[in-house]
Amino acid sequence: MEPANDTTVTEFILTGLSQTREVQLVLFVIFLSFYLFILPVNILIICTIRLDSHLSSPMYFLLANLAFLDIWYSSITAPKMLVDFFVERKIISFGGCIAQLFFLHFVGASEMFLLTVMAFDRYAAICRPLHYATIMNRRLCCILVALSWTGGFVHSIIQVALIVRLPFCGPNELDNYFCDITQVVRIACANTFLEEMVMIFSSGLISVVCFIALLMSYAFLLTMLKKHSSSGESTSRAISTCYSHITIVVLMFGPSIYIYARPFDSFSLDKVVSVFHTVIFPLLNPIIYTLRNKEVKAAMRKLVNRYIFCKEK
């Protein structure tokens, strides 16, 4: 997508997370460790669910899709951020900025919708166990996942369409380590009140509505489970799982609401919240959603033994 004709800015300067060399090196080691955990673990999750016939239920199909989105979500900002720790002048082209913005909102919104679908899956499994296979059949799962991706795509197109029509004539400095609408809109050479309101309505509304829907669904599930708390270990595990999922929901939607559901003014906490939103959240997803699952862990060990250590068991 090309900028408007009156656009003179061809690149943006990113301020990064810190200007201190020692701090940059520490952050590089930390974020590289996170990224090198996120990529192989999520790839292993996808391969395990794909290759193990015992993990064919809708829940695991949704987990594989979540792992795929996490790979892309973490890869939108992390590689450039890691390279920029060693670059004096951190720049990104106008086209690169628009691409980063597009994929950030595409994958991020898709993940929000997918988390909502996963909450519905948990509701069906816990509250309608006898009808679960009928309700959450493979066809419905594919439709819900496709709708999640489509919703994310439409949302992202709206953000990009609003940005590319704005004129940029300087300054061109973005006070962050990646491109996002909250920084880009602030440096446009025009009155952006209408665009800002549409973006807040779009991004903020998605975040708030999904967040409230998820909290209500998990509150309902916890109420149902605690009524049957005498059922034994399986109920205790389900309650623990719900609390873990609520943690992810808060960590995902809290920063998103803070960033997008308010006027796009600059605050001192913006960069810290952005780190939680783009780095910490993809790190915790596989830990809480998948690696606490005994069936998945057993299947992963089996897969590693078979294909890496060449052992059948």
Curated annotation (Swiss-Prot):
Record keyword Metal-binding present: no
UniProt GO cellular component terms: membrane; plasma membrane
MF annotations from Gene Ontology: G protein-coupled receptor activity; olfactory receptor activity
Tissue: Highly expressed in liver but not in adipose tissue. Also expressed at high level in testis.
Domain of life where this protein originates: Eukaryota
Subcellular location(s) per record: Cell membrane
Keywords from the named record: Cell membrane, Disulfide bond, G-protein coupled receptor, Glycoprotein, Membrane, Olfaction, Receptor, Sensory transduction, Transducer, Transmembrane, Transmembrane helix
Principal subcellular localisation of the protein: membrane
Glycosylation sites: 5
Note: The mouse olfactory receptor 4M1 (Q8VFT4) is not the one to one ortholog of human OR4M1 (Q8NGD0).
Protein name (record): Olfactory receptor 4M1
Biological source species: Mus musculus (Mouse)
Taxon lineage: Eukaryota, Metazoa, Chordata, Craniata, Vertebrata
Originating gene: Or4m1
